[in-house]
Amino acid sequence: MKKKFICAVAIGALVVGCKPAMDLDKPGAVNAEKLVSAASNDAEWLSYGRTYDEQRFSPLNAINAENVSGLNLAWFADLDTSRGQEATPLVIDGKIYISTAWSKVKAYDAVSGKLLWEYDPKVPGETAVKACCDVVNRGVAAWGDRLYLGTL
């Protein structure tokens, strides 16, 4: 009985801590089939570890030992924080979605680097003292045409 109560409280806390989902620009972007077959899709990074088994490995081979010295900066983004950054960006339909410190989210065009939109859940500053390891997070999750974000 005690275990069931603790489990119910934990699930409730998780649900309460989640913010409303944010819409992706293109409906139907992520589904079970895409997540399970992510290893065969080298154009996107749909989840935290890229593949369903969380290997965090990119199969792209356009950059190699012979041409790496000729690379130049295509674009960069200022994440507007001096705090830690631990989130893995998602790449879906040519857009990069990244969460930063304080659970803020930004969407960029992957080719141009243009900021498409940003979201600030307005996490109270006093929350920082409650976090064990700074105000970082592990990123957003995508399902269907929405992004999901857990906040402090």
Question: What positions do the PLM features span?
Answer:
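Bacterial N-terminal signal peptides that target proteins for export
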Residues: 1-6
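Repetitive helical segments and hydrophobic/amphipathic motifs
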Residues: 11-13
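C-terminal motif of bacterial Sec signal peptides marking the signal peptidase cleavage site
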Residues: 15-17
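Aromatic (tryptophan-biased) beta-strands that constitute blades/sheets of beta-rich domains
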Residues: 22-79, 114-129
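Repeat-blade elements of multi-bladed beta-propeller folds
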Residues: 45-49, 84-104, 129-152
